Each structure stands twice: as C-alpha cells, then as structure tokens.
C-alpha cells in the first residue's frame, strides 16, 4: 500500500515537477495478476487497479490489517469500473459478470471480493475507488445503459464531452462515494474548462483510452497558482479540495472521476472564470 499524506496548498505551490508527481500522481495503476493500492490521507480515499490474467485476485484480510480492521470493507464501500475485457467479481460467494464499462458498487461489510478475467487474451481491468462508509447499502451492478449521461461543451471550444454518472444518488445509494466516466468527443481536447474547485469534496481522475504517443496536461493547484502534471495512459491523479482539476490532451481521451467528502451534490462546485486563472 502506497500512503500519500495530505498537503497544504502553500506547500504544494513550492514543489518542482518531480515533487508534484510524487505527491499527486499514481503512475502505475494496473499490474498483471495483482492489485495496486494508493491510500490518501485526503478524505481517506483508496484508489487502484486490479488486472487478473493467469489467476484470480482477491482483496481481503491482508489489506484489513493495514487499515486496522479485520477485513478490507469492514468500514468501507467500494466502487469498480471495468475498462478492459469481460470479467467477474465475486462478493461473498455471489458472482457478478462485469463487462467492458460495466461497474459494481460493493457495500460496507463484504468480507471477500475476488476478481477474475473471462479471457486471458483480453483481461479485465478493474479500476476502483474505496471510501469510508457509515452504513451498508446493497451491492449493485451498473451498466452503461443505466447511467445518467449528460453532454456538455462545444466543438468550437474543444470541450465537447459526455459525462456518464455511474454512482450518483439518481442511480444508486452510497454513503459518500461518487464515480463516473467522461468521454471526450473525437477532436476535442479539454475537460472541465472553465474549471472549478469544490471545497467540500476531493476528487481523483484516472485517464485512459489514450495512444502511446499521446498525453494529457492535467491542470492543478489553486486558481491563482496553477501547475500541471503530464499524464500518460492509465494513470491517476489526486486532487485536493483546494485544487482545480482540468486537463488538455494531445488527442481525445477518456477519464474516470471519483469524489468523496461532505455531500454528493454533483453541481456543488465553486466555478472559476478563465480570465481569473493564473
């Protein structure tokens, strides 16, 4: 488990390129036949990836010991979105088939969660966010047909994109975790511009569906102290509440966003005008 401490905005603005990457970038999300796990002190979110190829991968008691509990989800909820080939997730003996861009919410209290791929030639890639939970909501599969899509932006401003809301109150109940998938239209490069912060929630972006020769310049920092981190395919970045979170790519891309914090009101954000950015 890779533990990342919280960081003050006044400290963050003094960091050089490598310093910013060390604090906020999750460089390797998927490792064959293993799970990766980054634990952030910011709202206690855990992010990572699971890519089973030649064997199943389970997340259970061994992680619980690192969290000071008996098992991983004793006091947590889990959200998973599969960006790879078809797979299965077995939760306490109940098997769910999770296809490409299907998702599974796992409620607090699940003791054993086992991940597998259907075809080793096209393995599943399970990206997950995990957050503290105060009660148990039912484990539920969510398919792309069940999400709440919203299309925003314009080709003229190169920010035409569709936001697919997987884990939001209109789709299913969670304690605090919200997740979704945003896909840019072909030829569009910007996400979340004009940008915003949200004092009451933190967020993690996971960029994927990118060519090897492409990258995204992820914008972060306070609106008057902006910085950037260069992101490549299948990498994640942590965004504290005080930071903007926006990006521009060399080509179109897709990203998964996950939020935890005070509320689940998607539009509860503090907008920043482009003219006010520095």
Curated annotation (Swiss-Prot):
Homohexamer. Signal peptide: none annotated. One of its GO terms (molecular function) is zinc ion binding. PANTHER family: 4-DEOXY-L-THREO-5-HEXOSULOSE-URONATE KETOL-ISOMERASE (PTHR38461:SF1). InterPro entries: KduI, KduI/IolB_isomerase, KduI_N, RmlC-like_jellyroll, RmlC_Cupin_sf. This is 4-deoxy-L-threo-5-hexosulose-uronate ketol-isomerase. Catalyzes the isomerization of 5-dehydro-4-deoxy-D-glucuronate to 3-deoxy-D-glycero-2,5-hexodiulosonate. HAMAP family: KduI. Its EC number is 5.3.1.17. It catalyses: 5-dehydro-4-deoxy-D-glucuronate = 3-deoxy-D-glycero-2,5-hexodiulosonate. The lineage of its organism: Bacteria, Pseudomonadati, Pseudomonadota, Gammaproteobacteria, Enterobacterales. Pathway: Glycan metabolism; pectin degradation; 2-dehydro-3-deoxy-D-gluconate from pectin: step 4/5. It holds the Pfam family KduI. Its cofactor is Zn(2+). Zn(2+) binds at residues 196, 198, 203, 245. Keywords: Isomerase, Metal-binding, Zinc. Belongs to the KduI family. One of its GO terms (biological process) is pectin catabolic process.
């Amino acid at each position: 488990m890779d533990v990342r401490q919280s960081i003050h905005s006044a400290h963050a603005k003094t960091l050089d390129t490598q310093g910013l990457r060390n604090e906020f970038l999750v460089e390797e999300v998927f490792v064959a036949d293993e799970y990766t796990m980054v634990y952030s002190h910011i709202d206690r979110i855990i992010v990572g990836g699971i890519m089973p190829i030649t064997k199943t991968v389970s997340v259970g008691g061994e992680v619980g010991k690192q969290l000071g509990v008996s098992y991983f989800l004793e006091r947590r909820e889990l959200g998973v979105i599969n960006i790879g080939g078809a797979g299965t997730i077995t939760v306490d003996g109940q098997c769910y088939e999770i296809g490409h861009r299907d998702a599974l919410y796992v409620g607090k209290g699940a003791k054993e969660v086992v991940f597998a791929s259907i075809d080793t030639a096209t393995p599943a890639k399970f990206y997950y966010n995990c957050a503290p939970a105060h009660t148990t909501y039912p484990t539920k599969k969510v398919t792309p047909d069940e999400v709440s899509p919203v299309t925003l932006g314009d080709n003229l401003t190169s920010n035409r994109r569709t936001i697919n809301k997987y884990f939001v109150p209109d789709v299913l109940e969670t304690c605090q975790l919200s997740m979704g998938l945003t896909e840019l239209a072909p030829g569009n490069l910007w996400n979340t511009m004009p940008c915003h912060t949200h004092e009451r929630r933190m967020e993690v972006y996971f960029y994927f569906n990118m060519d090897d020769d492409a990258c995204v310049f992820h914008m972060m920092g306070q609106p008057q102290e902006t910085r950037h981190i260069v992101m490549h395919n299948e990498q994640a970045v942590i965004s504290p509440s005080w930071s903007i979170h926006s990006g521009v790519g060399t080509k179109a891309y897709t990203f998964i966003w996950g939020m935890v914090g005070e509320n689940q009101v998607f539009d509860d954000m503090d907008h920043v005008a482009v003219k006010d950015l520095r």
